[in-house]
Amino acid sequence: MESVALYSFQATESDELAFNKGDTLKILNMEDDQNWYKAELRGAEGFVPKNYIRVKPHPWYSGRISRQLAEETLMKRNHLGAFLIRESESSPGEFSVSVNYGDQVQHFKVLREASGKYFLWEEKFNSLNELVDFYRTTTIAKRRQIFLCDEQPLIKPSRACFAQAQFDFSAQDPSQLSLRRGDIVEVVEREDPHWWRGRAGGRLGFFPRSYVQPVHL
């Protein structure tokens, strides 16, 4: 994921990352702290205050969901090349690309070289965004012609759908989305009557339907 710095930030601790307004940062981890993200800029890594940056949203980024949930999600989409990028369950800051091969889901670990560039095979990229764009027009598979292709969820509102949290909800699983009472959530999937999927505060995950009330903005 990429983000744009809204303001300049001077690091005051050794584990923080300084940046200037307008810099493009790579977000490595969004899950561990509600106020700070781990990011990279010009080969240096550190924590940055999330209110100083704006994350560039992408429908293909699913955060820290499990391999099993990724497979279930993609197999429900009867669409060759449907894909998502998820954070590694075992190695924070690392990513995997999960792709619908038609009869199964294949997973590719995104590798990184010392300079910080991402790659799957020979080609190197400065960001996950560049990697995704490349494999939209170049096959990601070696033995088959499979291109990354966006697809809308099976059930998608005709216009943006939002809900407001009526209660606090603490995620019990990495695939879930923690909420505070009053939070506004953009609902992106309502396939399950008990668990909806939505986006809030730059994070994407599942939350109980009974904890929210639809609203019109």
From Swiss-Prot:
Database matches in Pfam families: SH2 (PF00017), SH3_1 (PF00018)
Stretches of the chain forming a coiled coil according to its record: none
Main localization of the protein described in the UniProt heading: membrane
Compartments where found: Membrane; Synapse
Keyword Membrane applies: yes
Tissue: Expressed in inner ear, in neruonal fibers innervating cochlear and utricular auditory hair cells (at protein level).
GO cellular component: membrane; presynapse
Keyword Membrane belongs to the record: yes
Protein topology in the membrane: Peripheral membrane protein
UniProt keyword list: Membrane, Repeat, SH2 domain, SH3 domain, Synapse
Gene Ontology biological process terms from the UniProt entry: sensory perception of sound
Start and end residues of each SH3 domain: 1-58, 158-217
The SH2 domain, residue ranges: 60-152
Annotated function: Couples signals from receptor and cytoplasmic tyrosine kinases to the Ras signaling pathway. Plays a role in the inner ear and in hearing.
Stated family: Belongs to the GRB2/sem-5/DRK family.
Subunit comment: Associates through its SH2 domain with ligand-activated receptors for stem cell factor (KIT) and erythropoietin (EPOR). Also forms a stable complex with the Bcr-Abl oncoprotein. GRAP is associated with the Ras guanine nucleotide exchange factor SOS1, primarily through its N-terminal SH3 domain. Interacts with phosphorylated LAT upon TCR activation. Interacts with SHB.
Protein name: GRB2-related adapter protein
Source organism (scientific name): Mus musculus (Mouse)
Taxonomic path: Eukaryota, Metazoa, Chordata, Craniata, Vertebrata
